[in-house]
């Protein structure tokens, strides 16, 4: 039998993912500012941060969806 869709902690889990991603971005920005990197390493780090930014946007959107679903579930 399939597991039921348990969405109880999705918002909290997503918020933790946002915090973790922001921390990684900050660490990467610190490295870019203070460490000597060759052009390839710098480009890879900048590209990673661009992907992280896209992930943050997706997380924020998903948080809104989950909060809306939670409100709708409470109204039922």
Curated annotation (Swiss-Prot):
InterPro entries: SASP_thioredoxin-like. Induction: Expressed only in the forespore compartment of sporulating cells. Residues 27-49, 67-76 have a biased composition (Basic and acidic residues). The keyword Protein biosynthesis does not apply. Pfam families: Tlp. Keywords: Sporulation. It is found in: Spore core. GO terms for biological process: asexual sporulation; sporulation resulting in formation of a cellular spore. The keyword Transport does not apply. Its main location: other. Residues 27-76 are annotated as: Disordered. Belongs to the Tlp family. This is Small, acid-soluble spore protein Tlp. It comes from Halalkalibacterium halodurans (strain ATCC BAA-125 / DSM 18197 / FERM 7344 / JCM 9153 / C-125). The lineage of its organism: Bacteria, Bacillati, Bacillota, Bacilli, Bacillales.
